[in-house]
Amino acid sequence: MNPAHLLVLSAVCVSLLGASNIPPQSLNLLQFKDMIRCTIPCERTWGEYADYGCYCGAGGSGRPIDALDRCCYVHDNCYGDAEKRNCNPKVVSYSSKCDKRTLFCYDAPGSCARFVCDCDRTAALCFGDSEYIGRHKNIDTKRYCQ
């Protein structure tokens, strides 16, 4: 084999090995975002729900500080239940529809996709029904979430 071809092949192999260590992107996050958009008031963006309270966003600890934060707490627990079923909620794709602030999940009942869709649907509907309190965004979690 030509040394130049061997060098290129080696570089590709090294790149693929490095890429295999990169965690998968949260494919489901895009679907969850669409569900949230379906249920929240127009003046809010879905991004306002990240880093809200003790549970909306990455991780979570302590007691939820309000009803909206409780939605995230329940959602986190639902994802935990999905993982116990060997279902990765952060990467599974599901079939859903939004129609006039109503959400529908279409995957087969009992399937991983349906379970995750139901987790996201329940949380998004909860977001739509809960008051957003601006001062609970970006709170000091070390102080309020222990």
Curated annotation (Swiss-Prot):
GO molecular function: calcium ion binding; calcium-dependent phospholipase A2 activity; phospholipid binding; toxin activity
Signal peptide: 1-19
Cofactor: Ca(2+)
UniProt keyword list: Calcium, Disulfide bond, Hydrolase, Lipid degradation, Lipid metabolism, Metal-binding, Neurotoxin, Presynaptic neurotoxin, Secreted, Signal, Toxin
Tissue expression pattern: Expressed by the venom gland.
Subcellular location as annotated: Secreted
Alphabetical list of InterPro entries matching this protein: PLipase_A2 (IPR001211), PLipase_A2_Asp_AS (IPR033112), PLipase_A2_dom (IPR016090), PLipase_A2_dom_sf (IPR036444), PLipase_A2_His_AS (IPR033113)
A Pfam family assignment: Phospholip_A2_1
Cellular component terms per the entry's GO annotation: extracellular region
Family: Belongs to the phospholipase A2 family. Group I subfamily. D49 sub-subfamily.
Quaternary structure and interacting proteins, as annotated: Heterodimer; disulfide-linked. The A chain has phospholipase A2 activity and the B chain shows homology with the basic protease inhibitors.
Functional note: Snake venom phospholipase A2 (PLA2) that inhibits neuromuscular transmission by blocking acetylcholine release from the nerve termini. PLA2 catalyzes the calcium-dependent hydrolysis of the 2-acyl groups in 3-sn-phosphoglycerides.
Name recorded for this polypeptide: Basic phospholipase A2 beta-bungarotoxin A2 chain
Organism of derivation: Bungarus flaviceps flaviceps
